[in-house]
Amino acid sequence: MPAPVKPRTTAHTQAPHGMSRRDFLTLGTAAAGLGALGLALPETALATTQAADTNWHAGQLQHLIPAASHDRFLIKASFQAPLTRAPWLMVNGKRVAGEPTDAAGRFWRFDVRGLQPATQYTLRIVDAGGKPLADAWPLKTFPAPNATPARLRILAYTCAGGYDGPAIAGKTAWLDMTARRRLLARGMAFAPDAVIANGDHIYWDLQTSQNKPFARHVRELMWDKFGGALDMSVPMSHPKNEAIFTRVCDYQIGGLYGTTLRSTPAYFLTDDHDTFENDEFDDKVATLPPEPYGLIGAELTQHRYYPEFLPDANRPVWLPGGDKGGMPIDTNSAFGTLRYGTLLEAVLYDCRRFLDNKGMHARVVPQWVEDWLVARTRAEDTAHFFHVPSLPFAYSSGKLGDWYPDLLDKKTGHLVGNQPKPGWQTGWHAQHQRLVAALGQQKQRAAVIVQGDFHASAVGSMSRSAELEFAHPIHAIMTGTLGTGDMGFPSAFRSIETSPALSVAMQEALRPTEKNGFTIIDVTPEKMTFSLFLWRPPEPVDAIDTLQPALVYEVPRLA
């Protein structure tokens, strides 16, 4: 943890979009106490962090993203050129063989088991002859499940993917990659113990980019630069698609992260765009549940670029998304657990991949997954707990994949709940109600949901959901989007801003704010503290390096 430092007094000169001036001044008072959390950094801190990274030599590595538990590391890596023989990962001098995740030998994984909890290891990748391929670096295991750590810090955000190509009619589709990297660097400058990247690591929609007025621009300004159109009639790994697929993912994942996360365990959750489509339903296209080409694409992206979720003693190995050929043993591609001793448990779940259309019986996640989520929510065997769904609770923008029936009335420009929503299933909301009921029934822990997908930052406490009233509110945090450009914010793309769902009673600490950003989550035995950082062009890019929170939101433990 960085040492406490006095926050800069020059931060924040105007209220973020979505906040009144009065709200902003009130929240500014909370932000002034940031030094007590040890969050604020001197102006030179980011420069020092960047310089230290510059001094680390990545060698032939193109990218590297690790996962960790209390006894295991799982690392995905790619190299600038294929390796003809398998590399080794040295772990405190012990060799672990690399396993190829592509046919050419550019992509490799390293699965390190039998480690000691809360222990820092020195890692180094060497070639088959023992020659180093990059500098050594440290990586630490998490505390044992029964340990009692004093604190934990998490960096969380959503929607980091996207190609920052030429503007269309003066509007950007995704944030410039340089600014995106600086936002990531600013978040990493706070020395998080873990990173949660919640969904949409890739934006390369196929059908749902070609049913829009800007379809030609997508083909000419994006697809042609990466080799043309992907062929949906064959898998992404097919020779027709392999080169294009790899260029796209190299740019959006490898190009953003490089080796930045090498010493920080990461949790990459998937969402709709990771299956190469937006969630839509009309008379020509329906993208939920995802088609096989998208599902295979999401699996292949993860197989090569970022780790699956490591096993947890309280998560059944038979859940969907696990137990597949080619995956590391006992891991899961869609449902995961972040367990940090007895301090925190977080459950992560993809809300798109296994969604079904069974009407009143429909589910967003399968029954086995719902059973696991409810059981872990009711266990109350950690000081704190939160859900990390890829689909937000409490908020709506009227799109197909929402938990809610809310629909945009194009005549009034407002959400309505009294019109049929094409493609939407009543069973989705019924499952939503079962999940929030379990959250709201906790006796010792505050109910918290940390969520992604929506291109906004927001914080609110939900006291009612349809017929359910909660004795203690459910705190819903939208962590902020790293990669969204002008055209991707709901007010532009859907002609409506995100807002609390019509069936929800919500006290808003920060109304949905269409800016780029991230959230730092500090966890101690007494409370969780969420610090939300906001920035958006035309604000100066240099301002990112000293960015301070727009909101500091505390959630104490109930008992």
Positions of predicted regions on the chain:
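A detector of low-complexity, intrinsically disordered, Ser/Thr/Gly/Pro/Ala-rich segments
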Residues: 7-11, 42, 46-47, 331
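N-terminal twin-arginine translocation
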Residues: 17-26, 33-52, 159
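Short, polar/charged, Gly/Pro-enriched helix-capping and turn/loop motifs at alpha-helix termini
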Residues: 31, 38-39, 312, 316
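Residue-level detector of secondary-structure transition/capping positions
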Residues: 32-33, 129
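N-terminal secretory signal peptides
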Residues: 1-20, 30
